[in-house]
Amino acid sequence: DETTAGAYAIASILAKTIFWGTQPISKAMFPLSVENGDNKSQKRNILLNACAFLFVCIFAALVLFYLFPDLLIKIFSGKEIADSSSILVYVGISMALLAFTNLSLLYKVSCGKTKGAALFLVFVLLEVLLLLYFSANIVQFSLALIASSVTFLIGSLLLLRE
């Protein structure tokens, strides 16, 4: 229904700030990794630093989402929306996982590790199926989004491993 869609949209937009806000970290790492060519030690240091910085930013956002969901929803929507508040941290976790997936994929691309990338279509199909099947309510849908994000992260780590 429209009310549920609106509640999800508000939580989703707020949660996407995690993904959008961490993009510069991933994008800054890409040229640095390419620059270091065959120096695996230096590349790994860049990746670890990017992961640590990403973790700190994401952790801070998730703590805010967990502790103050009602306040955040009210600030950004102008009203209290209980359904949005109840899923904000879940959708935030999903976006956090996608931010780490993005970092992993950009790192692999910068290292020239793109073999097997076509298999990611399986993860897109899996996400669609999960979200279609688990759509009875907004919380269930949000948890399915986390599950699909976890599988995408695991896939990005396994399919493009060195």
Task: Label every model-predicted segment.
Residues D1-A15, S84-S85:
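Interfacial/gating helices of multi-pass transporter permease domains
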Residues I13-K16, M95, F123-E127, I146-L153:
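Residue-level recognition of pore/gate-forming positions within transmembrane alpha-helices
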Residues A15-N39, S110:
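Helix-loop junctions and terminal segments of transmembrane helices
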Residues T22-K27, L105-L106, S110, Y133-E162:
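C-terminal transmembrane helix end/exit motif
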Residues E35, I93-L119:
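Membrane-interface junctions at transmembrane-helix termini in multi-pass inner-membrane proteins
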Residues S41-F55, L64-L67:
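Interfacial transmembrane-helix starts/ends
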Residues A60-K79:
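Short membrane-interface helical motifs at transmembrane helix boundaries
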Residues A61-Y66, L126-V139:
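Hydrophobic alpha-helical transmembrane segments in multi-pass integral membrane proteins
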